[in-house]
């Protein structure tokens, strides 16, 4: 694959994030603006609660899933960024992808008196109770990576515009298919905005090609093992499959393993999202055809930088987009 291109992407985004460190607030939204139908990002109102006084440690509580390879990379970036900031302590708890557990963790952070809370939501359609709890307590709240269905004024979000991942992925697949073929979609967790919007992006592009059919669609819950099992099931039907559009790399790798076991490696195009280390290795080996880079470091650092700025009472952009980039061999 073109490592120069990939490194250029990463370095560009890290330069953007360097602005966070310099001014203690997130960088301006990149050129890839939100869709026209969305209102332009507004400034998140500073928290009513007084920020940590001079000399006091700013404590940031983070609740997110631990058992996920990509999110682990993002968590490590959050931790490293926090450790690099003087007078900042970042506390992590495992949400276990459970809505009730996560709400309890947010409530515990409030009781502990943290200065800001960062959430990677277990369910993007069920964030209102967490939002209300933080607002009632006057504690700044930042959602990261998974954009809530409802993002009220004063609550910040740092992440990527999920529909773009599906669009970039499917545009490349459609071109390689010559505008015709049977495509299957592996969904992530459908209670989460990322899976919903990445899938919407794939379908949006496919709709422009009358001879491309979405023949199968099912969740594999972001899991390599579930992706393997689902692909085995699809292959066992004998139905023609020309391409797999997976919502993330882990499911794509599982699909590749099933395709290889069936003796069909090289006969079916496989696409993922994240550009994880494992995915790039699969691409170098000629097994993964396309992925879309999602910057774990950029999102992680941006989320903590935004939380720090809000804890200090500084204005920030309500939405900070960290753009996706296509990655091909």
Feature locations, PLM:
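C-terminal motif of bacterial Sec signal peptides marking the signal peptidase cleavage site
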Residues: 18-22
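N-terminal non-cleavable signal-anchor helices
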Residues: 16-17, 50
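Sec-dependent N-terminal signal peptides
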Residues: 5-16
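A residue-level marker of the well-folded mature domains of exported/periplasmic proteins
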Residues: 3-6, 24-329
């Amino acid at each position: 694959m073109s490592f120069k291109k990939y490194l250029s992407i990463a370095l560009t985004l890290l330069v953007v994030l360097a602005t966070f460190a310099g001014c203690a607030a997130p960088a301006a939204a990149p050129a890839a603006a939100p869709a026209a139908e969305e209102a332009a990002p507004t400034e998140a109102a500073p928290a009513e609660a007084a920020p940590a006084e001079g000399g006091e440690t700013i404590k940031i509580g983070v609740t997110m899933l631990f058992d996920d390879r990509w999110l682990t990379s993002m968590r490590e970036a959050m931790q490293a960024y926090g450790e690099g900031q003087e007078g900042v302590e970042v506390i992590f708890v495992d949400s276990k992808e459970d809505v009730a557990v996560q709400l309890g963790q947010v409530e515990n952070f409030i009781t502990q008196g943290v200065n800001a809370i960062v959430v990677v939501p277990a369910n993007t359609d069920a964030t209102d109770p967490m939002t209300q709890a933080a607002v009632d307590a006057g504690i700044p709240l930042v959602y990261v990576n998974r954009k809530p269905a409802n993002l009220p004024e004063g609550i910040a979000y740092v992440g990527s515009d999920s529909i773009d991942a599906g669009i970039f992925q499917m545009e490349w697949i459609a071109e390689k298919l010559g505008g015709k073929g049977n495509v299957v979609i592996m969904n992530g967790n459908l209670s989460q905005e990322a899976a919903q919007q990445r899938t919407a992006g794939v379908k949006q592009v496919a709709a422009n090609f009358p001879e491309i059919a979405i023949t199968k669609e099912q969740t594999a819950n972001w899991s390599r093992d579930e992706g393997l099992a689902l692909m085995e099931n699809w292959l066992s039907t004998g139905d023609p499959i020309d391409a797999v559009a997976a919502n993330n790399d882990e499911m794509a790798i599982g699909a590749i393993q099933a395709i290889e076991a069936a003796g069909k490696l090289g006969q079916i195009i496989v696409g993922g999202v994240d550009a994880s280390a494992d995915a790039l290795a699969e691409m170098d080996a000629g097994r993964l055809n396309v992925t879309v880079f999602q910057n774990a470091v950029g999102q992680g650092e941006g989320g903590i930088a935004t939380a720090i700025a809000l804890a200090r009472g500084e204005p920030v952009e309500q939405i900070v987009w960290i753009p996706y980039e296509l990655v091909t061999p």
